[in-house]
């Protein structure tokens, strides 16, 4: 069993995989050192981070990862292996020589002694309009020039010191576009350059704890007043317009003799003379379906005589819309209903039954003219 034991890998064999942690040959170590650090060094091995003597003299950030300044223990696979950069997170000094270009995401690498210094490096939670209002409100005469506003922002908020072009343009745009800031020309006896900017007294209520409301309060007041005026107008116009809207409906309801133009809910019940017409129509339809042939002439219902001749011709059988009938009292054979018949022979217009009240349709089911009932298959 001992013949199968493999020897441990030698350090030179690991050099291609881990060239930056001190396992490369001397010539490779010198190559990396000369590439990243042009200055000459006496030996390839330097003191570790704990000494701290040569860290501040090399501002190159590549030194942390590829340079020989960090000499951690060799990388050995196993549960007790040392981390790749064990001492980089224990440094008690800034890792970069200058902190002027750091953003908010890099603040975790810096030793911040107090919260005041931290607030100097982050953006203040105020809009540009609020900054302008604070600057003007803090002035003795309640007015400032553009350069004085710049100076106030830069002195009180060091965050804006690193880049002046962007926020200064925003200050100018807010002064020009916001109605709360008024331009006041200089007096003739006042030497200097540029006009003064003041704050409109009506806009002081638009600032809540230094934050500008962006005209929300004023717009809401205007919208509420306009809405109340519109409501008053509609209320005043309702008594005048309501009779006009109800009169045409009354005229339509009264003009329809049989309730043909109005809805079934508003129609009065039809006269009882319509029932014999419907019974005669249904009896003739039953006789036609049970005894007639599909090739016979179309069905004509002479029972619908109260209508004029032209109306009777329209209501007899228009063959436009399909509204079949079932549950006929005289129907006895279900096999005749299953016979294929032309739809234009059995279908009829919905205007025939529109003359009658809906309670007549309770005994009329229109699902069996072309389709057989259940249990009547031949």
Curated annotation (Swiss-Prot):
Keywords: Activator, DNA-binding, Nucleus, Transcription, Transcription regulation
Disulfide bonds: none
Sequence intervals crossing the membrane: none
Record protein name field: Forkhead box protein I1
Subcellular locations according to the entry: Nucleus
Tissue: Expressed in kidney.
PROSITE patterns: FORK_HEAD_1, FORK_HEAD_2, FORK_HEAD_3
Cellular component terms per the entry's GO annotation: chromatin; intracellular membrane-bounded organelle; nucleolus; nucleus
One annotated GO biological process: positive regulation of transcription by RNA polymerase II
Ranges annotated as DNA-binding: 123-217
Pfam families membership: Forkhead
Region called Disordered, residue ranges: 1-26, 208-278
Keyword GTP-binding: no
SUPFAM superfamilies linked: Winged helix' DNA-binding domain
Superkingdom of source: Eukaryota
GO molecular function: DNA binding, bending; DNA-binding transcription activator activity, RNA polymerase II-specific; DNA-binding transcription factor activity; DNA-binding transcription factor activity, RNA polymerase II-specific; RNA polymerase II cis-regulatory region sequence-specific DNA binding; sequence-specific DNA binding; sequence-specific double-stranded DNA binding; transcription cis-regulatory region binding
Biased composition (Polar residues): 236-248
Biological function: Transcriptional activator required for the development of normal hearing, sense of balance and kidney function. Required for the expression of SLC26A4/PDS, JAG1 and COCH in a subset of epithelial cells and the development of the endolymphatic system in the inner ear. Also required for the expression of SLC4A1/AE1, SLC4A9/AE4, ATP6V1B1 and the differentiation of intercalated cells in the epithelium of distal renal tubules.
Protein source organism: Homo sapiens (Human)
